[in-house]
Every structure is written in C-alpha cells, then in structure tokens.
Amino acid sequence: MSNSSSISHFLLLPLADTRQLQLLHFCLFLAISLAALLGNGLIISAVACGHHLHTPMFFFLLNLALTDLGFICTTVPKAMHNSLWDTRNISYAGCAAQLFFFLFFIGAEYFLLTIMSYDHYVSICKPLHYGTLLGSRACAHMAAAAWASGFLYSLLHTANTFSLPLCHGNALGQFFCEIPHILKLACSHSNLRELGLLAVSACLGLGCFVFIAFSYVQILKTVLRIPSEQGRHKAFSTCLPHLAVVSLFISTGTFVHLKPPSISSPSLDLALSVLYSVVPPVLNPLIYSLRNQELKAAVWRLMTGWPCKCPECGKRFHSSSHLLLHQWIHTEERPFHCPDCGKGFKQNSNLVRHQSIHTGERPYECGNVG
C-alpha cells in the first residue's frame, strides 16, 4: 500500500486467538460496559434529580460521568463486536471517528479533573469567595471550556494523524485505533510531525498536572492549619475521591506510553491498554460513591424508586419539586396567590378553581339538570 488513500480499512489486534477466549472476552467486556453504564448513569441521574446536589462539585462530577460514558462507549462496543463475530476489520472512516472521540473524551476528562482540583482549592483555601469564584455561570463557562478544549485537542491530533501517508500495511497492534500504532504505519518522513504532536500533548498534560499539584499543595497547607481533627478529616475526605481518580488516570496513561521498550510485549501492552482505557470509567463512579456520603445517599434514594422523602411525615416523591410542593403542607406556605383578591393557595390547581369565582365560569355541570 503506497499511501493512506489506498487503505479502506484497518486490522485491529484480536483480544484472543481461540474462539472460546474470544467469547469470554466478549462476556467480560459486556459486564464491564454494563457496570460503567450503570454506575455513571446513576451518578448523572442522582445529581440531575437531587436538588441538594446542585453544587459546583457535583456539577463537575456530572460532566465527568458523561465523559466516562463516552470514553467507554468509544472503544468497547467495537471490541465486543469483533470478539463476537470473530473479525478484526474497522473501516478507515470508522478508525478516524474512533480516534477522534477517544481523544475528545480523554482530553475533556483531563481538563475537567483539572477544573475539579480548582474547585477543591477554592472550597478549602478560599471558602469566603466560593460563591463568587464558582457561581453557576462561572461553572458553566469552565465546563464548556473543558469540552471545547477536548474537542480542539482531538481535532488537531486526528487531523494530523490521518493526513500522514501510510506505507507499512494496515495492521494495528491495538484493539482500538490509537495514535502510536497508526504512526507505526506511516512513512519515515513523518517523524518530525510525530515529535510535534508529542510536544503539544506533553505541554498540555504537564501544564494540567502542575496546576493540579499546585492546588493540592495549597490545600495540604490549609488543611494542616485547621485546628480541629474533625475539620481536617472532613477536608481530606472531600479531596480523596478526586485525588484517587486523578492518580488512576495519570498513572495508567503515563505508564502505558512511557514504559521502557525492554519490558514491552503484545500481551502486556494489551493488558495495560485495557487498564487505562476501560477500567477507569468503571472505577470512577465507585470511588466517588463510596467516599461521598451525600452522593451515596442520593444514589440509594434514586434506586428505591421514590428518591425524595419528606423529613416531616416520611412520604416519598419522584422528584424534589414534588417534595417541595408537599412540604408546604407542613410549613403552611401558600405560594400561589390570586391576582384579583390576593388570597393564597398551596396548589396551583386550587388557585385555578378559585379564579372561576372572579371570571364567572362554571366548568362543572350536573349531569341531571345541567
């Protein structure tokens, strides 16, 4: 094959050589993907439905769960398809799309983790300015910037990678499309562009890492000055899930791409690729839900079917808005007021029936006399 224009498809690395192992890998990947969908889906639903979880920390966690869902849906379905149907093919356009979305979600996740470290820094080191620095508009702008940065990062790398002429076949040494394995098929004069891509990734990655490290150094200094042991424990408990997720994300990705060539082997490379591309989206929801009591309680309420419980009478409701309407019974609030006479009502339906007094409407007629 002389160049990339003559390549119609790529050959992905099979997960196993025998049919029995292929089916086993299919079942394993199916279980992993279902666990990731369940865990991240519960976090998204709990944060979206729980009014008390509408805070900057949980807003960014919701975005992180979305990236994890996209992350695992980019690579695992194709691997499952190939294992089930005993094939290795992926089209040229499909490979480009898979690489684009893989880089998009991994870039957005890294930027979101960086922003979440800033959220922890402000909440612990500058609590009096938390509402100003992390208002709803500021949080929306930062989340949008993370997604946009991931998009631009992915677009740059995908366009540069697939603009290279490919001279060394179409077999990839990976179970999904990844830049290093595509570059191995490129012609020799692509080394300079490869170094340029590596430099851009290194600068962005190192910049985010330095920002995260600086944030946690400042957090550690502030926490150590807290006089009470309970206060220090609460501060550490708040940061620990994020720190664990960041450590898992950075350590696995760094080791995969910077491991010594002397210890490299196809089986080890495959295992490490699964570790950094498939495992984190499954573990991230577990890490956050185990350490955060608010999130754990919200997920449990969501799984019960009637997640919102009235603290006064114990009655349960589907949403926090319905619970709020119900609580007016206990507080004697009457939020719906008639514009004509000013009388207050607990429910809007009662207000509508009352207004018929002023309009002269008679919506309910007797079936016998009208």
Across the structure, where does each feature detected by a protein language model lie?
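Recognition helix and canonical inter-finger linker of tandem C2H2 zinc-finger DNA-binding arrays
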Residues: 306-370
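Transmembrane helical core of 7TM receptor-like proteins
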Residues: 1-305
